[in-house]
Amino acid sequence: NVSALKRCYVGLIHRVNNVSAPRLPLKSYEDKSSFKIFAVDIGLLGAMCDLDSDTIVRGNNIFTEFKGALTEQYVLQQLKLKHEPFYWSKPNARQEIDFLIQTNGGIVPIEVKAEENLKAKSLKQFVLDNHPDTAYRTSMSDYRQEEWMTNMPLYCVPVI
């Protein structure tokens, strides 16, 4: 029950709603029945999941499975400073864009990667289908401008 969850975690979570279509304005396509929940802070998320520093430093199997969630959490925290992020998933398909933001009269898709694995099939298909002016992939890789998107190192996410 979402309302019970809200009462229990009021002030501790961010809710990121899906949009039914990647069109302007994003808010008018918001689907409040489909959403992702994030902690308000990456440290709080780690504490809620009993993630200790040894797990992060040593990179054991638990962290290998969890670092994608931590990376998405970090990116959301940075985006929330300037934007209202949404996400988008294609109905009945495996295509999902981690975050969509509306800025400068356009929609910007953002794909989040935890490592340097730079496959971004969903992002590439989104760009082909929707022709945004800007598309970002965030990762541990260096800044790189490609023909169809920009790779932003995770430390540069605040400038998006």
Language-model features, listed with the residues they occupy:
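Short catalytic-loop micro-motif centered on adjacent basic/acidic residues
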Residues: Y87, P109-V112
